[in-house]
Amino acid sequence: LPVVVDSWNAFDALFAWDKRPVMQPVGSEQRLCASYLGAAVRSFFANGGRRALIVRCGDPWPYLEAAGNRAAQRATRLAPLLAAAASPLDPASWIGIGHLSGLPEVTLLCLPDLVDICATEPAMVDVAVEPPSSPEVFVECSSNAAAAVEQDVGLRDLAPPRVDGEGFIAWRNALGTARERLARVHREMLLVAALPLPMQNARHADTWAQADFHAYLGNAGVLVEPDSGNGGRAVASAFVQLAWPWLRTSHSADLPGALEAPEGLLAGLLAINALARGTFRSIAGTPLAAVSGSEPLLAWSGIATTPSDRLAQRVCVIAPSPVGWVLHSDVTASADEAWRAGGVSRLMGALLRAARRAGETALFEASGAALWQRIERTLGHLLTAFWREGALGGASPEEAFSVRCDRS
């Protein structure tokens, strides 16, 4: 069942989010790391989020598994998350995102474990260990054997989750399935997701992911419009905001590779922006004091000449700037430029939610001129309030919008 938490401390008290086994325990020794769900919730509250609804889909599996086990278990792990058989009319069938049918107050949807589910087997990496520096002093003669240097490398010897070509398609299809549910049933909700890290040698057609990730996403069918050719499972939609790259932050040391996905951070920024400034306002340019690095490190020019600049037209990109790390773009993944600005999509979501609530209050009233006029006034007052805040153009409310509710 969904669990409501209003603070990080509340979540921390309820969930063993930092007890994920790195591998199957051997004897009494057990190495642990944080779960990606816990990391996303932590970043959400650290960046301004005020309230989260947690839907638990099962226990975390060991980060390091036997060869081939991740691919073999992928469909099994995706099933309770995507809830293909869940019916909006049957609460008993609700699991995973199926619970959205009973949570109309939700505005942002995150799937923090999705990349990890679709990733290939993680690798162990070598970590450079430097001997501690010490002042030069005379010591008693000893053998020439170098003293062993011990240093806690934390989780830096674990590579972060990366996807191969098959995993990337699985991630795209799963995210597209969630997007399709929002477009069909929950049009006022927004899906916030981190792009997965590709393998170092990942390429699609003639494009290497490491060289031009924007072109790679286009060739892989991620940034194309949903249609019959891809089964409606592409993610280029006004219902989706993608975030990139993966981040090294002040609290990511308990994750493999000391890197966290950026979706929790982006969701927190969107949440506090809605409360403090208005959901329709852009969060581009927000400084990110907790961020100290990224994978990969993006070059940024701001004049649309680098692959990172092109990527920022469709993806919320975090990169260094002369004043520190900032969120450089606030965009949806939509292929339609009219729906590209993130604030436009969020504004429409707010209007749809208000219209739904107005309709719910009048659901069992007699349809007629009196009811139509009341609904017109309700929506007119709402749109006027948005216009006064600058969400709508026009010199007057009459220029900015019109509302009509009648027999037609």
Where are these regions (language model features)?
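Long, structured protein-protein interaction/assembly regions in large complexes
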Residues: W61-V185
